[in-house]
Amino acid sequence: SDLLKDTVSSFRLGSAIDETSQICDYHIGQSHFLECWDMGVSWHEDTCSPVQPLLAPLFDTCSDLEVLSSLLKENNNSHDIVLDFFENFSDISVNFEDFLKLGTAKLVPSLVNDLPNVDQALLRIEPKEFTPTENSLEVLLTPDFHTWDGQFSNNGWMMECPQPITKLTWDNALLISPVLAKKLEQKYPKLELLPKATMLNETGQIAPDTAVFQDGKQKAPIVTLKVGDHHEYNAPLYVQPGLADYTVVSTIGQGRSRVGRVGSGTGFNSCSLLHTDSNRISTGATIEPTGDFHILANVQEHWSMEGRAIVRETNAKYYAEHEDFAHHMGAESHSPPMWGKDQDASIAEKATTTPRGNSAYEHPDHTYEHSETFGLHQWGMSIDLNQCTGCSACVVACQSENNIPVVGKDQV
């Protein structure tokens, strides 16, 4: 923003008026990428691929290529620019229609450049040694799960989709470790970061080292995170098990001052911590409570199985003597089995005919011989959670497919 003040005129090309538009003299409406023709070039710059629009521009907007063409006083539309590039720099043995069908074409050798060898330059980068402590913390800035760098702040599906680790929605928070949380509570007794100790959570069975909930809503203390003498901002604390003891994680892309109706008033802006020397990693930070609290929309209030032994194990000797050992572990062991006519059947047979506790409905016959029986339920789903990366595409897809409304922070 300081550099823009020295320019005669400044233009902002964007799909929406935002903070950058406010400090520029002019705003140019940018077409959505699904409304534009474009061209992609491979990493080795030997092939190119077309980018075709899905629909014509809905509004009177311009694509990136059209703006550049106007600056060159050519005033061509994006389709003509892509066609001209294809005819002059690609393999002429393929016509434009086939290029669109195949999705790729070779570039002429004169356009291919040798990539610089950056491997050795990367190896010469020496990491800065720093050992964080309770009074000198390390701060890591990462893109926000809901908004990335802020461009999705006005997307209700993104904002309401729970963060895969913290399960937070509609907000961001400073993530700290349980070790640092206990240190801060010792230093500031009124901080209320962790639930009060009970006989159960002292043994790690219920809500160990997580958060304080009040009337079903998470109550998070607001603190001031200060890095150096000129970089600080206020945000709520969230205790996240698994973090390094004295590392604080903060996300960028939230708390925008100029955004649409959906993203207005959400999150906390941590961009004040960005400076030329940090490169998203800062050291020597401190945390100080402000005395205020913030309600976080956390959709998961507990983090333990609470007596449900989902994963059950034993040794080979005990299994040989007690094949049904799994039924005598966890809360399920307190409900007696009701096998009925299948009392003398094998365990494998019982599992396919009569559910434990005697179901209120008749168990469907899913054997191959009866697989085509009219009226038999054919739908099923199998999810391997070992392959889950936390992308949460399934969550947004479910909300979209089933027309589930966006309800906002208060009702999520």
Regions found by a protein language model. Name each.
Residues S63-N88:
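Non-catalytic, well-ordered alpha-helical segments in soluble enzyme domains
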Residues S1-L58, E87-V412:
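A cross-kingdom feature strongest in bacterial/archaeal respiratory oxidoreductases
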